[in-house]
Amino acid sequence: MEADPAPSSTPPPSSPAPAASPSRHPPGEEGGGAERVEVEEYVDPPSPDCCGGADPDHAPPPSPKGEEPVVSAEEEQAAVAGGEGEALRSFLEEFGDQGDDSLVPSPKLKQINTPDRLAALRFLGGKYNSLLERYKQQVAKCAEECAPRYDGLKKKYADECAERRRLYNELIELRGNIRVFCRCRPLSTAEISNGCSSIVQIDPSHETELQFVPSDKDRKAFKFDHVFGPSDNQETVFAESLPVVRSVMDGFNVCIFAYGQTGTGKTFTMEGIPEDRGVNYRALEELFRLSEERSSSVAYTFAVSILEVYNEKIRDLLDESSEQTGRKLDIKQTADGTQEVAGLIEAPIYTIDGVWEKLKVGAKNRSVGATSANELSSRSHSLVKVTVRSEHLVTGQKWRSHIWLVDLAGSERVNKTEVEGDRLKESQFINKSLSALGDVISALASKNAHIPYRNSKLTHLLQSSLGGDCKTLMFVQISPSSADSGETLCSLNFASRVRAIDHGPARKQADPAETFKLKQMTEKIRHEEKENAKLLESLQLTQLKYASRENVIKTLQEKIREAEQTSKTYQQRVRELENELANEKKAARDTARSTKPPLAPMRQRPPLGRIGNHIPPKAPLRLRLSKAPTIQNKENIPVMLNKGSSGADTSKAVAGKARRVSLTPVIRHIPLQPKRRSSLAVLPTQREQLSIFPDKRSVSRLSHIQMPRRSIATFNSIPATPLAAAAHKQVDGTPEARQLRRIEFSSSKFRSPPALARFNSRNNALSPQQKLRLASGSGNASKICFSVQKRVILGSPAPVKSSLLSGTGIFNPALREKMMAAKIGNAQRVFNTNRRKSVL
């Protein structure tokens, strides 16, 4: 078959030669020169077979995978030797640079007349294969260099996602929001056969967003904590729920419940199937795994309870007795504010197999029924409660927490499910309880003061989970079918309201006994804080008082220092004055010694009568009158004399027995004398002595009365004779005489009875005339001692005089002051009003 020259001269547009792969290397690379040398080796005249009878259209095109055409060495040598490649050589010489880089434009290539088209294709094929090989090498090299960086960035991205999820979970816990996970089931076979389409769009790169697209024009976005698509399995769903489940082991209350319309997969998510178990079983399995992991420090015990709310009645699903249908269970509120079902069975569990057995028993006893929407539709709300009690083995601290796993009955439309009879009644109760749940959610989202928890048994049981101290997770199950768009939209709106609830962060739940202890400790701490506040206030007041007293003390100290300084000044002044006074006294004494002549010796002194001109004048008398001592006043206490007692009859004085001898009076009349040495006594003159004693002109020097030594001779100046008594009344009746009347004979603090009675009773031999003889005469007057002190005069006893003095001269006050008071033995006692006026 001959070749057409026209087509051979101009290649067809579909020729692969112009469509060569562009170069992956820059024009200046060394590899291009090497390949140019190799190409020049191939440029030889083509063989006659190729030029003559070969059809260029049947030439093998270059392999896109880089397979080079098989050309033997003999053919290459023949082509070079034959010189059939002159046209190709001229082409390479003209377009060598462009050909090396495979950048020859196709229009330029079309205008070249090449007789050897096959050689050009071989050349381009080889060039393409070499470039492709170089490209693969570069890709492998880049992949080798970038693989570690890619792995690092991938790991960093995963860590950042985990950190963001952790921070988001912490934020939710701090805010107290209810976590909401949305799970969309796949379309069922019946829905696909009915021509239903999906109205839910989920972007795998945005795990928290969901697009609700009921039509091309309508589109609404919803945001949740996580969105699971139809392809997500049970393990993926539980992995996101794992942090909430683990918090039960730390002492927090947890509630996980599934909400949605009938047939959306709530029971499948919570319970699952034996081949692919749900959240309930996986959560309990995780709890047992954590208990074994922490067994060295914390001891855990588990108990499970399963109940259902059917037609607003609570049934215990673990009670298989025949009486359980008629048994009524009520909800009680405990002291710590949580809700408990009185009489509910709490079965202890020890292994995960025991958990599965209990769950199967509860699922068997649960109320289910067939509807047009679901053959095994749940006709009640199922609640699984797991109580976890833990005790720290080191500190002894105890906690009690629980986890609620709730599978709610599906909300449904009566006209759509086509139920009647008992199923219709069940649907009404289900919708009523779900409506009450919606009211509670709305009230919580609006933060109303009153939350209607008691409108339904379901909401009453979930009170602590929805609005209390609990971590809550909600699965909202939706259907992607366009036939259920209304129910899906309602479920999404309800889940959005639930996600907006903010009830504060959850707290650890302690054991009730521990709670009571904590309350007592809290009360004690509060009381101590009040006491501390009072003490602090008292301390502050004390500090203020102390500060004020410090100021007062400082002021007083200043005053004390000033007073001390003044005292020192005064003391200095006093010393100076004392020195001056001492000097003056010394000077006065010196002057007195020099001016006053010395006194003569006592034996050489002249008689008192001869120096009468030197007697100083008498000082004024200060008389102190007092009563005579009585028997009652034994202490000789001076008593002033009453005026009415001046006329009393002294002869009637009662004599008493004295315990002590009174020698000196208590009170003496001492006239004030100047401080001069004048020891001269005033004695009665000779005329006065003669007037008193007219019948006695000369007496002995000293008169004595011999008496026993233990006796005392004391007498009153008032004579016992009638004449003397009358004279006494005459003289003593005047005021002057009453003032001068003093008769006190006591020198002791013990008083003596009246001296007259004693003298009369013991010394009857002494007559009144002998008493008058006791007065000294003119002979012994110069030697009588007139002094306060006792003066003893030794001498012979005075002879008893028998002469009786007549007249009233003895009542003269001047003479009566000088009368002798008593005599004991050879000692005579006399009165003297002038102190230190004595002449021996």
From Swiss-Prot:
GO terms for biological process: microtubule-based movement; spindle assembly. This is Kinesin-like protein KIN-14J. It comes from the Eukaryota. Pfam families: Kinesin. Residues 177-501 form the Kinesin motor domain. PROSITE patterns: KINESIN_MOTOR_1, KINESIN_MOTOR_2. PANTHER family: KINESIN-LIKE PROTEIN KIN-14S, KINESIN-LIKE PROTEIN KLP-3. The gene is KIN14J. The keyword ATP-binding applies. ATP binds at G260, Q261, T262, G263, T264, G265, K266, T267.
